[in-house]
Amino acid sequence: MPAPADIQAATLNKFLAAWREGSAPDTMALWSDDFKQRLLPLSLGESSFRSRDQAALFYPGLVENLRNWELHIKEIVHDSARGTAAVYATSQADTPFSGEKWTNEYAIFLSFSEDGTKVCRLEEMMDSAFYQSFVPKFQRYLMGLGGLKK
């Protein structure tokens, strides 16, 4: 049985505040031990879920490299009876790549832990055109193969 709606809502508000602030530590503190994350649409080829440890390898590096981060939450749907929430948002930021902005559009789907205090599942529907353009460059950058112009 899902946790009470007010507990879930408090967790959702903390998650959204951490996302809005671009705080990887605060976001990850809300991930349950059995947290799993998946990128959507499935056409991106990312059909399997990442574990908490796998997601933690990429997420902090991404957040730390986005400057002047702005998140605009457009819609929130919280289904407390199912222990889930959906959020539609857009974001923009400066990236490590000269002349290239982060401009992304999301629909995220969260599931709460049984006690409602953690996020146990996160599915992120991303702008596939942006993802296919940005993510390979960023992965190379994180591996030290890309160039950062100073």
Swiss-Prot record:
Pathway: Secondary metabolite biosynthesis. Signal peptide: none annotated. Keywords: Monooxygenase, Oxidoreductase. One of its GO terms (molecular function) is monooxygenase activity. Gene3D superfamilies: 3.10.450.50. Its EC number is 1.-.-.-. The keyword Phosphoprotein does not apply. PANTHER family: AUSTINOID BIOSYNTHESIS CLUSTERS PROTEIN F-RELATED, AUSTINOL SYNTHESIS PROTEIN F-RELATED. Monooxygenase; part of the gene cluster that mediates the biosynthesis of the tetrahydroxanthone dimer neosartorin, which exhibits antibacterial activity. The two different monomeric units appear to be synthesized by the same set of enzymes, among which the Baeyer-Villiger monooxygenase nsrF is the key enzyme for the divergence of the biosynthetic routes. The pathway begins with the synthesis of atrochrysone thioester by the polyketide synthase nsrB. The atrochrysone carboxyl ACP thioesterase nsrC then breaks the thioester bond and releases the atrochrysone carboxylic acid from AacuL. Belongs to the avfA family. This is Monooxygenase nsrS. It comes from Aspergillus novofumigatus (strain IBT 16806). The gene is nsrS.
